[in-house]
Structure formats: structure tokens, C-alpha cells
Amino acid sequence: MSNKFLGTWKLVSSENFDDYMKALGVGLATRKLGNLAKPNVIISKKGDIITIRTESTFKNTEISFKLGQEFEETTADNRKTKSIITLERGALNQVQKWDGKETTIKRKLVDGKMVVECKMKGVVCTRIYEKV
């Protein structure tokens, strides 16, 4: 994984996030809070363990994982998922599976920004972060 991912990132733009949350099955009240949140994402690495911490006024979440190894995750909207994150062509690709459903979250670096692309049932959400 590129060390360029490491550090603190702040959300600067979000496109289609409400539709993505709807596709996930997130309720109206939680979607409203999620749309208002402007999270910071802190990515760190210790040995071969990567940690992604998301902090916002809505909720803080943290996942720690090894690339290519499945782990259990409780998401900000309280889904209990089996997740796996791999590194492909410089991008961190995450697959979350729960209740027979699946979503993908791809994190890639473009022009010094972290572009996060979330896909669920044909809905695509793009969130862009800048390094703090």
C-alpha cells in the first residue's frame, strides 16, 4: 500500500451519497445525519495492520485489517458485515457482505486527493477527500 494514503483526510465533496445510503437500506433519520456529516478519515499503518478511522459529529468508526484477510466490521449505520480489503493497481478495494447483499468501496489517489467510490445495486457515490 502506498504511504501516500497515510494521514488525515477531510471530506471536500460528495456526490450521490443519499442514493447510495438508500440502496444500502439506511433509514431516513440516519441518512439525514449522514448527509450532514463532514467526516475526517485517518489512515495509519503499524507493521502489516492498516487502520482506517472515520470521525464525524455523527459517529466515529474504526477498522483494522490485513490486506486480503476477511474481518468483521460494524458500519456507521450499524450493519454487521464481513469485509475484505485488497490492493489492486494502487487502489484499496473493499467489499462488504451482509444478509446476502454486497457493496464495494474503492479508495484511490488522484492528483493528491483521495477519491472514494461506493457502489451498491447500480448506484455509484463519489466522495472526495483532501489531506489535512
Curated annotation (Swiss-Prot):
Keywords: Acetylation, Cytoplasm, Lipid-binding, Transport
Disulfide bonds: none
Matching CDD domains: FABP8
GO cellular component: cytoplasm; myelin sheath
Subcellular location: Cytoplasm
Family: Belongs to the calycin superfamily. Fatty-acid binding protein (FABP) family.
Known partners and oligomeric status: Monomer.
Additional facts recorded: P2 protein and myelin basic protein together constitute a major fraction of peripheral nervous system myelin protein.
Function, in words: May play a role in lipid transport protein in Schwann cells. May bind cholesterol.
Protein name: Myelin P2 protein
Species annotation: Oryctolagus cuniculus
